[in-house]
Amino acid sequence: QGTRTTEGVPTGLITVPSAQERSGDFLGQASSLTGKVSGTYLASLLSQKLGYAVSAGEPYYTTGCSSTSACVFPGATIPQNVWSTPATNLLNYIPAPNSGVDQFSTSAFPETVRDDKASRRVDANTHWGQLSLYYFLDNYRVDNPYPQQQGGASIPGFDALTYGQAQLITLSDAKAFGSGTVNDFHIGFLRYANVIGQPQGGLGVSLASQGFASGPTGIVVQAPQFEGVENIAFPSFVMGVPITNETQNNNTLFLSDTFSKVFSPHTLKFGGQFHWDQVNEHPNATFNGTFNITGTQTGNAFADFLLGLPSNFTQSSGEPFYLRDRYTGLFAQDSWRIRHDLIFNFGLRWEYIMPFWEKYNQLQTIIPGRQSVVYPNAPAGLVVPGDPGIPSTIAPSKPDNFAPRLGVAYSPGFDHGILNKIFGTSGNSSIRASYGMFYTAFPGLSAGIMYAVPPFGYTYLSSTPPLLATPFISAANGTQAGNPFPITFPPHNVSPSNPYTSFDFSSVIPISGDPYFYYRNDVPYTENYMFSFERQITPHTLLTMSYVGNQGHHLLGVVSTNPGDQALCLSLSQPSAVAPGSPTCGPFAEDAVITSSTRQVYRGTRVGLGPNYGEVTAQETIANSNYDALETTLRYTGRRSSFLLGYTYSKSIDQASNLGEQLNPLDLRGTRAISAFDMKHNFVASYQLALPFDQLFRRNNRLTDGWSLAGTTRFSTGLPVTLYDDSDNSLLGTLGNGINNNLLDTPDYDGAPLEINTNPRNGKSAFNVAAFSPETLGHLGNASRRFFYGPGINNFDLTLNKLVRLTESKSLEFRLEAFNAFNHAQFYGPASVDGEVNDPNFGRIVSAASPRLLQLATKFSF
């Protein structure tokens, strides 16, 4: 099977610099210019470029300012002689607005897909049993114009390739041992080799030609093959070459065996499963650096960009790593038919689930106070496999994972009375209930995200807002951070008997960007339960009503273990509170070395792990979730038509919907909210109708026979709107580290009516944006991460089918398929509403699902 598609991908509405802002005129955004010059060094740089005196603490602009004695930029205009060289050059890669004053949108750049699949199956009936050999091959290539999942751009010009090949081979044997006894055996091997996010657009432009410095104060190019337009994240868009390209080869060997024995009234099953996994990764994760610009200095992100004042700079380095995993599971169950109308199922499953380990022990964790014996010069707390009490899996593999499952099915029957109306006679209805525990293996991502952590790698995160051209120099006071790149890593034969002391930990302190795996983690599990009633209304109609629920326990979550002390940072946030020449504390500066006005030196304002650590997070099994749903279906199956109607009313709550969402270190339940995937109401109808052209025209031939219409109709409420505040005004410093796409911060909400609007055609926002505001400095926003919903779905997919029978064994089928048949604008999706309070598009519906798509298909059967 081969697939070739070329489809334009819409960017949605993106806020870009207006024509006035591209010339340095910010009078239209003057209200956002609330910042002050953060230090004496920056004041000196500005003075040199502007030709007039600028002082630390001076406002960049105040309302009505027209004199250089009152503000840095009179008239809210930034002259070009003060622009940074990188900003001047990179401005050419940012698209100009094409939809209003500061909006950009296009679908002119396509995603191209080539996907080729092939399979082969051979069956043989032998004295060994029914043997089946199956082989499957999938070779694909995708050119994505907006590779945002790889940290890539959301504007045109920076596409990336993802390509690879999957192969699966399985051998199965079903052997019967007399009546009622069967054994099923399966063994297989899966190989998945792929390259993810290989940059294509934006290459061939050196960092030096863009204006970035080299040497100790600049960016060391560690991946010259991917050197190109520098990656920069703004509140509303990302530009530049993708930063998380990798080559990944996965191998899985699996086998299972199930033995079944039927002896009335019991059906017994025993069996087991085993799989062995390899994940071999060769990443290029931020090897050439990335900037985050949020408006930390002036209050306006694009003004900061022109001035060359990013919020932070990140660069990583690391070696290939090779993850390993084993799983073993055994089970036994009995289906006991107690009576003809009553069945009881019970079973028990035992699972031995291991966290991933690394072939060369290139993993680590943090235990306060512990000193590594494998790396004796490591900072206290940083330990690795081989250190006392630290297994290769970091957390122990526990053998006590027993999971019971219970179920009952009862078919009541009554011949008369009110119960007959409800349940009908025997066989017309059924009542089912079940309960089960299900353990969940740790994802490979839990180990993979520990890549680029000392001593096996390093992620540099600027301790204070730096300069764009020289990102290892602090903008506020000119302090030069040590540039550790390139890094020499330890050999693979390090052990307690062969310790290693040559890694220079002093060059990577404070250690930041470390999402370490907690050494006391438990295996996550869920408790699932359901109760259902099924009633046959007519011989062709079946009604089902169910309650379905589950609870997740010991779920893996990410939480900061070294957050900033908000009160301390706030007390050091004003120039009068610090010594002359010292930087102040503020957003993204929680790791700065600050000297107070009383000459007390603070090596950052973080609490928990000490000054040797910056922003680090723990992956801990401390989260939970809850899901409850009412599910109803109505099924009709007739001679010429059929339909299935389904409605679900549900609610899902969790503390984090994925590893990219942090938990609140001050209150673990503080992030508990509706899940990112929660869908309150969901109605789906699928149907098929034989078109009676033969009866209408009273002719039965190839022209009138074989016509049918099928389709799927869906009406549902939208997904929740996720709220963010990327300003770090909370002063917690919960910065991104490779898995956290956003900070913990959320806006403030004043409790006013939300005024939900799901139709952007009326020009209104999706909700009342006036009810929200950026965080107050030193305080975490009070808005829940998610508590209301965006636009829903109103969609029809239709298929017109014509079957032509050529002979008894040959037929030709024609299909006309229409997706979103009525071309209804679907403002639906997890990111359809902008929830970033600092983005000018905050509260706007910025994207829509695909428009109508028509597809013709022909199938020849023989």
Predicted regions and their residues:
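Structural signature of Gram-negative outer-membrane beta-barrels, strongest in the C-terminal barrel
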Residues: A174, V182-G188, N250-N251, D325, ...
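Short sequence motifs at beta-strands and strand-loop junctions characteristic
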Residues: P110-R114, D123, L161-Q165, T247-N251, ...
